A protein has these predicted regions:
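Conserved aromatic beta-strand anchor motif in extracellular beta-sandwich/beta-rich domains
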Residues: 77-81, 118
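Extracellular Ig-like/FN3 beta-sandwich strand-entry sites
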Residues: 72, 111-113
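Short proline/glycine- and polar residue-rich coil/turn motifs
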Residues: 92-98
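Exposed aromatic-hydrophobic patches
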Residues: 63, 98-106
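Short, exposed beta-strand-loop hairpins at the edges of beta-sheets
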Residues: 107, 115-131
């Protein structure tokens, strides 16, 4: 499975849409604003957000944006298929705001339920995003 990750600068993050719902904070004030699954990234924004993806798209992305990053740190995107850890991607964050993403290349065996856990440097779960891959 091929995995690729990228990051956005604080200025680029300013163009991101805001998110409603729960905001996760850790003890240092790291604030996760948005976590979405999507079909791509264009102009530093998620494209075609969804929770069900067709094998035909070939690749799935998890886009995360952090509204407050008090210091340089890392987060993890842990990709699980049917409750089995498939891959972990370590992503760097920079103050004061940051966006980042990771992706997986889809294979025929990847059909079914998935979840992605976003964890902070201390391995505390900030958010869980569930999605499925279908024909």
């Amino acid at each position: 499975m091929v995995l690729w990750a990228g990051s956005l600068t604080a200025g680029e993050l300013m163009a991101q849409e805001s998110v409603t719902g729960a905001v996760a904070n850790d003890s240092r004030g790291l604030t996760l604003g948005q976590a979405v699954m999507c079909e791509g990234i264009k102009d530093y924004a998620p494209v075609n957000k969804a929770v069900v993806f067709s094998m035909e798209i070939g690749k799935i992305y998890c886009f995360t944006s952090f509204d407050h990053v008090p210091e340089k740190t890392i987060v993890y995107h842990n990709w699980y298929r049917r409750d089995k850890l498939v891959t972990t991607k370590r992503l760097s964050l920079q103050p004061p705001q940051w966006s980042t993403f990771s992706s997986i290349q889809l294979r025929e065996a990847d059909k079914g339920p998935w979840r992605l856990e976003i964890k902070d440097q201390a391995k505390k779960v900030l958010r869980i995003v569930k999605f499925s891959v279908t024909d």
